[in-house]
């Protein structure tokens, strides 16, 4: 495999980087750091239960595809490999958007103690697959697909031609 351009690969993270979880992902954050430095980037994540067969099969073809695919200024690729057996993987879904949800719904159970104090215990429940919006990254991985999508930087200018006020005030910060 030969690469025609320099790129940053971040990951492979254990656990999905989908939906709202992208916001605090170190894997996606590292890819964004590369982007800030003008380097195209791909963030990879995988949810597996002891087997990396799906990742092993799809990783190189996905890398080859994405390195030859155009991506907008201010965007990175985000790839998530499903947590299923290879025989249950249904292929690749492209152009997945981040779901407006988290894979795990986090709660705290509050228990009052006899002395009047409280104990808070964290509790996480996995999102029901039927709640994942169709076309989203979570829907793809929950249904046994490799999910490929773009994540846009909220700080860097996008590839569209619009000029935001902050770009006019701080133009030197946005040169790639």
Where are these regions (language model features)?
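Secondary-structure boundary/capping motif
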Residues: 19, 51-54, 158
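Glycine/threonine-rich flexible loop motifs
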Residues: 16-25
């Amino acid at each position: 495999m030969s690469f025609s351009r320099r790129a940053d690969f971040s990951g492979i993270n254990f656990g999905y980087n989908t939906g709202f979880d992208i916001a605090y992902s170190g894997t996606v954050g590292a890819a964004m750091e590369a982007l800030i430095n003008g380097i195209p980037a791909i963030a990879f994540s995988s949810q597996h239960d002891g087997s990396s067969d799906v990742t092993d099969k799809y990783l190189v073809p996905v890398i080859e595809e994405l390195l030859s695919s155009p991506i907008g200024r201010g965007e990175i690729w985000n790839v998530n490999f499903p947590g299923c057996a290879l025989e249950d993987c249904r292929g690749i879904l492209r152009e997945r958007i981040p779901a407006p949800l988290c894979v795990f719904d986090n709660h705290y159970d509050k228990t009052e103690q006899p002395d009047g104090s409280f104990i808070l215990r964290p509790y996480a429940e996995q999102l029901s697959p039927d709640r994942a919006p169709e076309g989203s990254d979570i829907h793809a991985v929950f249904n046994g697909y490799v999910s490929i999508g773009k994540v846009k930087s909220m700080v860097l200018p996008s590839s569209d031609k619009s000029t935001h006020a902050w770009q006019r005030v701080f133009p030197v910060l946005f040169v790639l």
